Amino acid sequence: MVSFGGLARKIFGSSNDRRVKTLRQRAEQITALEKNYENLTDEQLQAKTAEFRAALAEGKSLDSLLPDAFATAREAAKRVLGMRPFDVQLIGGMVLHERGIAEMRTGEGKTLMATLPVYLNALEGKGVHVVTVNDYLATRDAETMGRLYNFLGLTVGVIKHGLDDDERRAAYACDITYGTNNELGFDYLRDNMKYERAQMVQRPHNYAIVDEVDSILIDEARTPLIISGPLEDRSDFYNLIDTFIPPLAEEDYEVDEKQKTAIFTEVGTEKVEKLLEAAGHLKGESLYDIENVAVVHHLNNALRAHKLFQRDKDYIVRNDEIVIIDEFTGRMMPGRRYSEGLHQALEAKEHVTIQPENQTLASITFQNYFRMYNKLSGMTGTAATEAEEFGNIYGLEVLEIPTNLPVQRIDEDDEVYRTVEEKYRAIVRDIRASHEKGQPILVGTTSIEKSEQLAERLRREGIKGFQVLNARYHEQEAYIIAQAGVPGAVTIATNMAGRGTDIQLGGNLEMRVRQELSDVPEGPEREEKIAAIKADIAQLKEKALAAGGLYVLATERHESRRIDNQLRGRSGRQGDPGRSKFFLSLQDDLMRIFGSDRMDGMLQKLGLKEDEAIVHPWINKALEKAQKKVEARNFEIRKNLLKYDDVMNDQRKVIFEQRLEMMDEEDLTETVAEMRHEVIEDMVILRIPKDAYAEKWDIAGLKQDIASKLNLDLPVEEWAKEEGIAEEEFENRIKEAADKAAAEKAERFGPQIMTYVEKSVIMQSLDNLWREHLVNLDHLRSVVGFRGYAQRDPLNEYKTEAFELFQTMLANLREVVISQLMRVEIVREAPPEPQLPPMAGLHIDGTTGENDFDEAIWAEHQHDDRIVPPAQRDPADPRTWGKVSRNEPCPCGSGKKYKHCHGAFE
């Protein structure tokens, strides 16, 4: 029975269909211009860029230029790349220009499609970023598509690992910049740790097109980019805690795979308490006393490391390091580390060198980084299942772009077996049958461990010539995946490894030329060999087509339908035939976690025998229902995390904007005066509360504050004895004295040096306090969840307390800055050590018995204003001190070493 909604869609079409229809009409208008542009010479076509830029300067909009700009880019692509964007690619290009996400099937030409909106938006000269998932794709696309942009007079840069700041600055200054999401995000964080605007590498965030947008904005949304610095080494402690976990019995802990949590039971808590007590690490009477918060945190991390994280699935051990594996792509993520001690717990578990824990210096999530762009769009093969999330969080509408040719892939129903062993036997049988008839096969697995187990089975069964593509062999990824379409090829791949590289039936011409002709120079011989490779690929393609096209065989369903759809989408590109099938067992993670017990009972009642599978559309629907539940739960988690991160993000914006303002300021006198006055007001109100009786005044405390925060000695005791004096008069007198001292210092330093000193002190203090604030916010976030048990909203509690922490940080900033500026003095560099005659230091005056060594030096350097004899130093005037050795007693008379007194502020 057709629902009313279904009936309406049949009559009127879906909103997606109606939108595509409108855009198709615009695409036809662009195609109508094609003849005119074909008749232009190269020079006339190239001149269009200057023509469009002049029109923009006169006030025309990008939208008004779109038809002609797209027609120009299409004609340039035909001439430079030998490729003509189809009308569906024009439609996709318009979606990208209009802040949308273009869902385009694998092999339909997303990379070429992106050149149209990239060219149009680059005309403004504000910078366009094309974001990809790895350095290989960024470099490949920048080189290939760069030829098109260069032909049209635009500059192209690429951001990749290993570039220095000058190279990065040059790449960002280009009209078009290709780079990975990680590199762009880290450059933003590093820029906001710089002290001069000239040192920064990025321009303001104008327009970004994110390739594989679902991977970056959904799968990686929960992973923050963190720049951190090392703390003290605590490897012995991690190793000790790790020894407590292996002896535990199942009754000692509970693991919830659905929620991905592991906790100690009451029995387990008692056991580890005894172990900690024996090791001398238990403070107080109970493990959960406040003094043991850090110990509990490390114990929980050790339990998670052992019971939730699996080697070769979640991470691998390589070169004495734990390398995280991306759960969505199966790729290694070198350089990425779990935070808050979890990575160290994994290192202890695997007995590799434990790296020191890190303190966060700066962090941002991809969600908040990409929301900074004035205009954002994306493209992928699979986004429709996450359309709600893209709309809610990023304000991006997903549009499914029709394929240029009808899809001929056959998606078969899942085969469900009772055990993993039965499932793998069926997979091997199916691979053998397809391999023998010459059909190329892509086998999708969910982890490195499972891909290698399957490879071992194929070896035992005598199936040869297969390739394993997983995080261990990341370097060969593109080549292996490009050749997966050769007849009879068997490629075992973890999840979406090789994403971004097409699987072309018969093989990939570009890859084969690169591999086979790398040492053959340009010329007739090379052309002849390329022609031979083309003919060979065409012949192999015919064989692959005759065998049924690419067969995607999946060994397990993923939690997300989108990941399954990505795998399916590798087959049937550009109208080619193909097929896909999922092999499942009731022992698979998804089935086991989401209620396979009922299904197992049902299959037993049906009398399912060993090695028999059940195949029915109902099972597919039941699995999709389970996946939808997981997706909805993950969306809620990401949405909730974003609400918390938005609190920090608002504070981050304020701090980073303040830093930028500081960089641009040429005179900070007023800013510093305001800070100084606020510090004085806070100081006075604390010690002399408004309307309080004189007996309640803390004059001794006020005097101490003035000395420690303002470096002044004021007669506040005398002022307090005056008749009728109130807190306002105290404030005014202290401000007047502090302003006078600051003005004298500014006159001594000169305006240029004073501004430099003020800027340095403010920015360094701001950075240090911001780092401490990030740690405080992390701690607050880790405990605020428990407020829910007291019927209080954890998010509101977090917002309130995070704001209070922020206010405290700003108050501390004022105090630290003013305290340092009131003490700072310029000390000129000491001259080179004087060359003294031998034994000069032992020459003692026979009359007085004093060593005249010091006097000899002063005599020799009496015209050098950097060295002042101790006798001529005025303790109250640092200007008379000259160069003071750091280990010398401080000339102020405090009794401390210089480096611990006035020298601390140099």
UniProtKB/Swiss-Prot annotation:
SUPFAM superfamilies the UniProt entry points to: Helical scaffold and wing domains of SecA, P-loop containing nucleoside triphosphate hydrolases, Pre-protein crosslinking domain of SecA
Main enzyme class: translocase
Membrane topology category: Peripheral membrane protein
Binding residue positions for Zn(2+): C890, C892, C901, H902
Subcellular location: Cell inner membrane; Cytoplasm
TM segment ranges: none
Residues that bind ATP: Q89, G107, E108, G109, K110, T111, D502
Chief localisation class: membrane
GO biological processes: intracellular protein transmembrane transport; protein import; protein targeting; protein transport by the Sec complex
Domain of life from the UniProt record: Bacteria
Co-factor requirement: Zn(2+)
Cited InterPro entries: Helicase_ATP-bd (IPR014001), Helicase_C-like (IPR001650), P-loop_NTPase (IPR027417), SEC_C_motif (IPR004027), SecA (IPR000185), SecA_CS (IPR020937), SecA_DEAD (IPR011115), SecA_motor_DEAD (IPR014018)
One Pfam family named in its UniProt record: P-loop_SecA
Catalysed reactions listed for this entry: ATP + H2O + cellular proteinSide 1 = ADP + phosphate + cellular proteinSide 2
GO CC entries: cell envelope Sec protein transport complex; cytosol; plasma membrane
Keywords on record: ATP-binding, Cell inner membrane, Cell membrane, Cytoplasm, Membrane, Metal-binding, Nucleotide-binding, Protein transport, Translocase, Translocation, Transport, Zinc
Cofactor note: May bind 1 zinc ion per subunit.
Region feature (Disordered): 868-887
EC number(s) reported in the record: 7.4.2.8
Gene Ontology terms for molecular function: ATP binding; metal ion binding; protein-exporting ATPase activity
Family: Belongs to the SecA family.
Functional note: Part of the Sec protein translocase complex. Interacts with the SecYEG preprotein conducting channel. Has a central role in coupling the hydrolysis of ATP to the transfer of proteins into and across the cell membrane, serving both as a receptor for the preprotein-SecB complex and as an ATP-driven molecular motor driving the stepwise translocation of polypeptide chains across the membrane.
Family matches, as PANTHER family: CHLOROPLAST PROTEIN-TRANSPORTING ATPASE (PTHR30612:SF0), SECA INNER MEMBRANE COMPONENT OF SEC PROTEIN SECRETION SYSTEM (PTHR30612)
Subunit organization: Monomer and homodimer. Part of the essential Sec protein translocation apparatus which comprises SecA, SecYEG and auxiliary proteins SecDF-YajC and YidC.
Name of the protein this chain belongs to: Protein translocase subunit SecA
Organism: Brucella abortus (strain 2308)
Lineage: Bacteria, Pseudomonadati, Pseudomonadota, Alphaproteobacteria, Hyphomicrobiales
Gene symbol of the encoding locus: secA
